[in-house]
Amino acid sequence: MKHGIQSQKVVAEVIKQKPTVRWLFLTLTVKNVYDGEELNKSLSDMAQGFRRMMQYKKINKNLVGFMRATEVTINNKDNSYNQHMHVLVCVEPTYFKNTENYVNQKQWIQFWKKAMKLDYDPNVKVQMIRPKNKYKSDIQSAIDETAKYPVKDTDFMTDDEEKNLKRLSDLEEGLHRKRLISYGGLLKEIHKKLNLDDTEEGDLIHTDDDEKADEDGFSIIAMWNWERKNYFIKE
């Protein structure tokens, strides 16, 4: 919950400062792993690979910033773990100007493959966040996706206690000392300026009651002004 509320505030401030920016929702995956040791190494490799990829010239030249969250899900058929990143990417409008600036899905796949030093084509999804959604701001939807819990207990709990303990042990080892939420670029600067604490290490004692009131009163509604070609925050 806390990450979602903080992210809403950061995105709202970005839009106020740079109303012409555009947004992408990126999902990056690699092959599944089967135990805690493999999971821990894979998550470390992904964090390093992501940093490398965001420095590639074609990506970096239009990059304003990003918000990244790592999620782990479990395949109940083979008991493997799927680790993937959800990334809300903020780019300059020039990103969509021409082929010299625009990064298509095939290129995202190749960039991620190169950054991760993989010998296979990974599954990468990239979605342009549309200016307006009939029922809900697409930006809010993307924030909700990146703000999900890294692992849901309903994903790994079964009727088999031994299996549950094994999964819990794997996840504890796999997630040990891993930063699952991070900001970059302008979003990181704004997160710091707003004095938002670390969602992984900050004050969690007062989260439920204090943040619930905040959540009720702060849901980002980013509307698109078609004449000015920019976003504005609807009060």
From Swiss-Prot:
Pfam families, alphabetized: Rep_1
InterPro entries named in the record: Rep
Keyword field: DNA replication, Plasmid
Origin superkingdom: Bacteria
GO molecular function: DNA binding
Binding site for DNA: 149
Keyword GTP-binding attributed: no
A GO BP entry: DNA replication
Family, similarity comment: Belongs to the Gram-positive plasmids replication protein type 1 family.
Protein task: Produces a single-strand nick in a specific site of the plasmid, and this nick results in single-strand replication by rolling circle mechanism.
Protein name: Replication protein
Organism listed in the record: Staphylococcus aureus
Gene symbol of the encoding locus: repB
